[in-house]
Amino acid sequence: GFYFRSIQGFYFKRIQGNICSEPKKVGRCRGSFPRFYFDSETGKCTPFIYGGCGGNGNNFETLRRCRAICRA
């Protein structure tokens, strides 16, 4: 019902806010994976190269996904 959707929306917004405010994290491995992160200073999804491990949630495989999650 409505109550469940409200709670679900609240938690999604909390997760979304936390992920999108995390700093870009390349990671400690030496891979070379093109990714996008949300830059909270510019308000835009920006490309970066991810090393393959040790990243965080602000790491999206596509620009479209970054924009959808972070509303950029």
From Swiss-Prot:
UniProt keyword list: Cleavage on pair of basic residues, Disulfide bond, Ion channel impairing toxin, Nematocyst, Protease inhibitor, Secreted, Serine protease inhibitor, Signal, Toxin
UniProt xrefs under InterPro entries: Kunitz_BPTI, Kunitz_BPTI_sf, Prtase_inh_Kunz-CS, TFPI/VKTCI-like
Residues annotated as domain BPTI/Kunitz inhibitor: 20-70
The UniProt record lists the keyword Kinase: no
Primary location recorded for the protein, binned into one broad class: secreted
Disulfide bond residue pairs: C20-C70, C29-C53, C45-C66
Annotated localization: Secreted; Nematocyst
GO function terms (MF aspect): ion channel regulator activity; serine-type endopeptidase inhibitor activity; toxin activity
Influence of temperature on activity: Thermostable. Complete trypsin inhibition at all temperature ranges (25-100 degrees Celsius).
Gene3D superfamilies in alphabetical order: Pancreatic trypsin inhibitor Kunitz domain
Domain of life: Eukaryota
GO cellular component: extracellular space; nematocyst
Other noteworthy facts: Negative results: does not show activity on the eight potassium channels tested (Kv1.1/KCNA1, Kv1.2/KCNA2, Kv1.3/KCNA3, Kv1.4/KCNA4, Kv1.5/KCNA5, Kv1.6/KCNA8, Shaker IR, and Kv11.1/KCNH2/ERG1). A synonymy between H.magnifica and R.crispa is controversial.
Name of the protein this chain belongs to: PI-stichotoxin-Hmg3d
